């Protein structure tokens, strides 16, 4: 099949969150399985261009309509991780993607409306006829109504549209007249059955448009797909998702084991694998390798070399991620004879300031270290050198960090929500087979909830080493590669392609 993904992010060159990793991982797996896969993203001035090979101009002066005028664009083509990627560079006086950032501009909505119209115009003008156009999140959701109501009428009819929702919190709400910028009649779409926002009827909801107009809709875990049908997690779109439940499914994200793998990880000072894991108490070879990385991590972050577990946390510092719980656990972990490492940053100035104050408070603390900027090397060291990994999210569509932690033999402590509930089975769960248990789970998003899970984990680490070793083994054995997830997508691609 020929599949084109249109997205706002792509790892490793334009990454803000998990969306970038998902687009790369899924596309690589589809390509490895013999499918023709292309990707279209904006040509950001701040992306890591060194990750692009053989970048050349593919379409010079592509015209695209915006706000009553036609503007030229240059479309570049290059190769990223052996995938063909098209980069759209607008020649618009507002320099939509020359801002030194991926998101966070006041006119983000207009930037991605422009990108969406231009991406579709490129496919149409070049007569590129894929079987599937796969859209991601609100930034490209408007392509679905654009395609169905404009480009199909121009004779561009072959592709089917699949739309993936990565996070219901971000929906792309705008005024009806904003759709006029890209040639759609905004007033026409301000109807409940089209794109009218369910909570604020004077607004248009781009995410809703993606749901209504796509041939199929997915989200990033089976449990999150159930949760978003409820008012709590549906964020106002639960009724729309219930209405279109016949074309809606949750597919768990995978991770790329060619990158996240302690056996071959280029960032680690030593390597270890499941095959080398100890079979009994006397066999300490691999534990010693993980312990060696733990020692290096402590030295790098000036933590005390004591018989204590390290609890790691790698996250964006936004309310969704349970930042109040993270702040609370710092002291609790130390009181329970643990050490805590945080790697994260926040796009929200008040939260960023708050954590910088905490960092100052814990300067030179022998058991606490906060890193408030991204470091890929440190991320890998923390996954490998930690004993436990906390993910206290208030909601979590899928979550990748807990899956990565499992591969590194680092036991997750998570809240039971979204994809965390799909991937982590509590060690004390009575209805699960012993080899399926791989972590600690709590329900209530409060201090008592997370404290109880941390206490159980730390107690096991100190008092039940054989049980702890088995938890590590169980996690490392689990397969969350893209192989199975990509097969689920392929079945949907094939099913919707077969429909007239």
Curated annotation (Swiss-Prot):
Domain of life: Bacteria
Record keywords: Glycogen biosynthesis, Glycosyltransferase, Transferase
Any one GO molecular function term: alpha-1,4-glucan glucosyltransferase (ADP-glucose donor) activity
Pathway: Glycan biosynthesis; glycogen biosynthesis
Amino acids binding ADP-alpha-D-glucose: 15
UniProt name for this protein: Glycogen synthase
Phylogenetic lineage: Bacteria, Pseudomonadati, Chlamydiota, Chlamydiia, Parachlamydiales
Catalysed reaction equations from the record: [(1->4)-alpha-D-glucosyl](n) + ADP-alpha-D-glucose = [(1->4)-alpha-D-glucosyl](n+1) + ADP + H(+)
Protein family membership: Belongs to the glycosyltransferase 1 family. Bacterial/plant glycogen synthase subfamily.
EC number from the UniProt entry: 2.4.1.21
PANTHER family, A to Z: GLYCOGEN SYNTHASE 2-RELATED, PTHR46083
GO BP terms in the entry: glycogen biosynthetic process
Gene behind this protein: glgA
Function description: Synthesizes alpha-1,4-glucan chains using ADP-glucose.
InterPro entries documented for this protein: Glyco_trans_1, GS/SS, Starch_synth_cat_dom
């Amino acid at each position: 099949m020929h599949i084109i993904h249109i997205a706002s992010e792509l790892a490793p060159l334009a990454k803000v969150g998990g969306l970038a990793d998902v687009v790369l991982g899924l596309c690589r797996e589809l390509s490895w399985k013999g499918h023709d896969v292309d990707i279209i993203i904006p040509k950001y001035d701040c992306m890591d261009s060194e990750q692009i090979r053989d970048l050349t101009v593919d379409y010079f002066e592509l015209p695209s309509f915006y706000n009553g005028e036609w503007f030229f664009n240059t479309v570049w083509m290059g190769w990223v991780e052996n995938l063909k990627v098209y980069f759209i560079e607008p020649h618009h006086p507002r320099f939509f993607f020359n801002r030194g950032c991926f998101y966070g501009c006041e006119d983000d909505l207009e930037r991605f409306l422009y990108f969406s119209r231009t991406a579709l115009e490129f496919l149409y003008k070049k007569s590129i006829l894929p079987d599937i156009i796969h859209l991601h999140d609100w930034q490209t959701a408007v392509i679905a109504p654009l395609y169905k109501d404009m480009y199909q009428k121009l004779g561009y009819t072959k592709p089917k549209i699949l739309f993936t929702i990565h996070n219901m919190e971000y929906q792309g709400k705008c005024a009806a007249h904003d759709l006029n910028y890209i040639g759609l009649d905004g007033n026409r779409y301000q109807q409940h059955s089209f794109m009218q926002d369910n909570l604020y009827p004077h607004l248009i909801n781009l995410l809703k448009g993606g749901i209504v107009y796509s041939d199929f809709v997915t989200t990033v875990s089976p449990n999150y797909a159930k949760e978003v049908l409820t008012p709590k997690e549906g964020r106002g779109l639960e009724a729309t998702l219930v209405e279109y439940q016949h074309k809606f499914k949750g597919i768990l994200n995978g991770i790329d084991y060619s990158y996240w793998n302690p056996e071959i990880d280029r960032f680690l000072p030593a390597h270890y694998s499941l095959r080398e894991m100890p079979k009994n108490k006397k066999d300490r070879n691999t534990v010693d390798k993980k312990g060696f990385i733990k020692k290096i991590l402590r030295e790098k972050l000036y933590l005390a070399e004591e018989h204590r577990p390290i609890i790691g946390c790698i996250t964006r510092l936004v309310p969704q991620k349970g930042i109040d719980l993270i702040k609370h656990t710092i002291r609790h972990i130390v009181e329970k004879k643990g050490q805590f490492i945080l790697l994260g940053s926040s796009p929200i100035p008040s939260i960023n300031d708050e954590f910088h104050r905490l960092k100052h408070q814990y300067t030179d603390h022998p058991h606490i270290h906060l890193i408030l900027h991204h470091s890929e090397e440190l991320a890998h060291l923390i996954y490998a050198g930690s004993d436990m990994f906390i993910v206290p999210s208030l909601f979590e569509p899928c979550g990748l960090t807990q899956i990565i932690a499992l591969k590194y033999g680092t036991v997750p402590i998570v809240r039971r929500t979204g994809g965390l509930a799909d991937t982590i089975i509590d060690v004390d769960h009575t209805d699960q087979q012993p080899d399926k248990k791989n972590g600690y789970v709590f329900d209530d998003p409060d201090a008592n909830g997370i404290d109880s899970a941390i206490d159980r984990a730390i107690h096991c680490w100190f008092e039940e080493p054989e049980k702890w070793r088995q938890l590590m083994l169980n996690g490392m054995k689990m397969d969350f590669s893209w192989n199975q997830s990509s097969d689920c997508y392929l079945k949907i691609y094939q099913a919707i392609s077969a429909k007239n």
